[in-house]
Amino acid sequence: MLAFAGVVHIPWSVPKPLQCIVAVARNGVIGREGKLPWHIPEDLAWFMDQTAGGVMIEGPACYAELGKALPGRGTVVVSRDPAKSFPGAERAASLAEAIVIADRMDQWPGPVWITGGERIYAEGTPLCERLLITRIDRDFEGDRFFPADWQKLFTKLVSSKAGEHEGLGYRFEVWER
């Protein structure tokens, strides 16, 4: 299982709240071959509602999964490849640079969201004040995982009633430091 990455140093304090949003299978899977291994419309609606008006920080695979920069929010893609472009999004070479860019996006006053994938979660989750997690009530095969030790960093504030889509159970939870 994936553990948290080393310390990410931000050059100055960041006034916008830094939060994380993720959907995770019971066995920690968050992706398979660049895609979500499930389709839950209510989870997508939750994601869209929560991140609206803020800035999303994501890796190239997450950008590709969404197909574009989503409207109604800013997007910063962390990619070490300076030749890659991401229409509608800013590019940063590191998570620290992405956080600084996101914080300066004044047209998006909402929180800065860590939205994946695996490496971005490993580096970014320890920096977050709040974690919004969709707990998927099933194991999935996958090749991308959420850090296994995340519960050491947060305390659960609230959990929704269990939902179900096509036999797949899920629950929305909010965790905070």
Please place each PLM-identified region on the residue numbering:
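Enzymes that bind and transform nitrogen-containing heteroaromatic metabolites
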Residues: 9-177
